[in-house]
Amino acid sequence: MADGHSFNNISLSGRGGKNPGLLKINSGGIQWKKQGGGKAVEVDRSDIVSVSWTKVTKSNQLGVKTKDGLYYKFVGFRDQDVPSLSSFFQSSYGKTPDEKQLSVSGRNWGEVDLHGNTLTFLVGSKQAFEVSLADVSQTQLQGKNDVTLEFHVDDTAGANEKDSLMEISFHIPNSNTQFVGDENRPPSQVFNDTIVAMADVSPGVEDAVVTFESIAILTPRGRYNVELHLSFLRLQGQANDFKIQYSSVVRLFLLPKSNQPHTFVVISLDPPIRKGQTMYPHIVMQFETDTVVESELSISDELMNTKFKDKLERSYKGLIHEVFTTVLRWLSGAKITKPGKFRSSQDGFAVKSSLKAEDGVLYPLEKGFFFLPKPPTLILHDEIDYVEFERHAAGGANMHYFDLLIRLKTDHEHLFRNIQRNEYHNLYTFISSKGLKIMNLGGAGTADGVAAVLGDNDDDDAVDPHLTRIRNQAADESDEEDEDFVMGEDDDGGSPTDDSGGDDSDASEGGVGEIKEKSIKKEPKKEASSSKGLPPKRKTVAADEGSSKRKKPKKKKDPNAPKRAMSGFMFFSQMERDNIKKEHPGIAFGEVGKVLGDKWRQMSADDKEPYEAKAQVDKQRYKDEISDYKNPQPMNVDSGNDSDSN
């Protein structure tokens, strides 16, 4: 690059471990972005005070200090990168990188260098280690000569590491010449006071700037008292207590709920907090929109006139979610994202949908999509490969809904289901305006193509891109597309078919996959005819006329006939149906099958194995019983005739 350099695998080093990402260095400054999204660092050229090189294990480390006292460490440079970048810093920034050497002697005595908000321990003028004073939570004098620095033990630091630094103790003898004291104030006291002044902490526990009591938090679920401190926030609940440094706060989201008196406030974290084995990258809070609060900030006059001048006010009175986000924004330095230009059919900021088995709302934002409240899922536009509108295959009430599939560049997919039909135009227009690729209508994802399918008439077929694709491609007689059409017409209540082998594991909604299989095998010609655009009603009548003679004997089943074999999915459904009803009180009967289908698809082959084993046993049972049934003894024949005569 003529105007800069780009590196694909550079890690940002800190208390949270090493996070690999993309680093760009140009004449305007330094930008680093974590791989897979999340934390980002931007340092303007005018804010850079100094740069330095340090030789570390297997690579080189670039240190960047800013006017605000922040110190960034980027690790992963090759030896051949050092000369070219050093020349670039000299020519573009006017900064000559210093070369820091590490001490490997193993000695634990030396000198302390305090610069900005960084403490560096030197052994023989070489660096042994360094820590950021911004991570210091408090200091304590131990005896006459020892000073202990305690670090923030928050729930995000070291989320990807097994160990995290908690405290360091320094021994400062009375003979120390760097921190000169007197009889009433020994060198250890001088050192302690110096750290307190530079780290902006008190010798005791830091008081909260402001506290919001009994806030409803949906993820992780519970009611918490939210304390905003100068360098961290704390969530105090009855069962859990989380401490989060502001350096882990990536962004704030302020998202009102449509037609409801609540507002979401989301705090995005990197690294996330951890509760047991569960990671929470987003804290989802729910405020009552009309609640008014009056808060007084507990901040010294010195800080109000320096660090927070023209940012924070001494007191606030207003809506609780606005006061909360305003104070948190300036304390943490994170930006706030609010709804953009998108409006739903009800003039709201989001559309109702479901993700996996959870109902929620999807917010189309200016730079991404955000599904709330559970599981909170943020998808940036830069991460999206394409989107696709999908019509429900089933008929009836489901025909008034559609799905939105978002496929990421990492090949991961998010399927947002059960979006109301009247939101189709709004979503398509918004997504098109963002330049996102739309894989729809057989690849013809144009505005005219979608408009032809999404006409304003009330015909249910108008919203079905798959049905239109079938009609346009009738000559090809695509079995895959015809499956969807036959599925919408044939409704035998999801009963099992005669074939109940291993293919049933693909069923997603209470045996729907089995219905597909039966339709494909027995009526291929009728499927092709349906693709020519015949009305569903006429198709059904024609099918009834042509098969009336065959169907009459089947109206009454032989009670002595053996019970059909069940698939692995059906065994799974029997076991889990009651659990689903307990987890989702009041769930509709039709939704139970959808939830079961989603859970079945997410299960691994090992998890399915017990149910598939039962299916194989049941299949053999049915095979044996049907053999005896079809080859009965004379007595059994008489019994069968008696049954038919009843």
From Swiss-Prot:
Biological processes annotated in GO: DNA repair; DNA replication; karyogamy; polar nucleus fusion; vegetative to reproductive phase transition of meristem
Predominant subcellular localization, coarse grouping: nucleus
Family: Belongs to the SSRP1 family.
Name recorded for this polypeptide: FACT complex subunit SSRP1
CDD domains per the UniProt record, alphabetical: HMG-box_AtSSRP1, PH1_SSRP1-like, PH2_SSRP1-like
Residue ranges, annotated region (Disordered): 471-569, 601-646
Tissue expression summary: Widely expressed. Present in embryos, shoots and roots, whereas it is not present in terminally differentiated cells such as mature trichoblasts or cells of the root cap (at protein level).
Knockout or disruption consequences: Failure of fusion of the polar nuclei during megagametogenesis.
Origin superkingdom: Eukaryota
Biased composition (Basic and acidic residues): 514-529, 601-628
GO (cellular component) term, any one: euchromatin
Keywords associated with the record: Chromosome, Developmental protein, DNA damage, DNA repair, DNA replication, DNA-binding, Karyogamy, Nucleus, Transcription, Transcription regulation
